[in-house]
Amino acid sequence: AKANKAPWRGAGIYAAVSTDGGRSFQPEHKLADHSCECCRVTSAIDADGAPLFMWRHVFEPNERDHALARLKPDGTVESVQRATFDRWKVDGCPHHGPSLVVDERGVRHAVWFNQKDGAGRVFYGRLAAGSGISVEGQRQVGGPRAAHADMAVAPGKLAIAWKEFDGERTQLRGLMSADGGDSFSEIALAATDGASDQARVIRRQNQLFVFWRTEKEGFRLFPLP
């Protein structure tokens, strides 16, 4: 693009597949051009074992929504589809990547940050698979200052965690669902008045935890109900 003096937005997304537990990798393949430069990429395993990747994408003319790629066994692209439809027009990277999980029924769940109707928010939704992805059950997560949400699943459980500044302290909060994302109960996990990292929801066997590092309290692990 530079050689041809053509306009170019974002960066390329590449993936490489390992079939021996990470000891070696097949040659990398490009998934797509025009990803948002600084938002993290998330990955998950689809119901049939195929790798999935989700990232913030720059759609024409300048909408920074999200894309979802599904790979073939050799690491080449099977499909790349638009995954969210909030149509946020911004000429810059918001530094908020999504999170994606697939539950035991094969349902894809995602959380992401976007601006919709003029306000920046964290959202949750189920990404219905098919010839074109549709978002089901989209709902706001947290309040107007919610940020950097993450999620994980265990049998019969779906958990979302995020941090949110209340004007004085940064709160760590969570949502739990036992019905596949149809309804949620909110829980307060912790708070800090210092700097903090992005929380991560992790799974060990059938138990879910939230892992959070803060400047004053250090590393902490919170078991979820």
Language-model region placement:
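Extracellular, repeat-based ectodomains that mediate carbohydrate processing or recognition
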Residues: 1-225
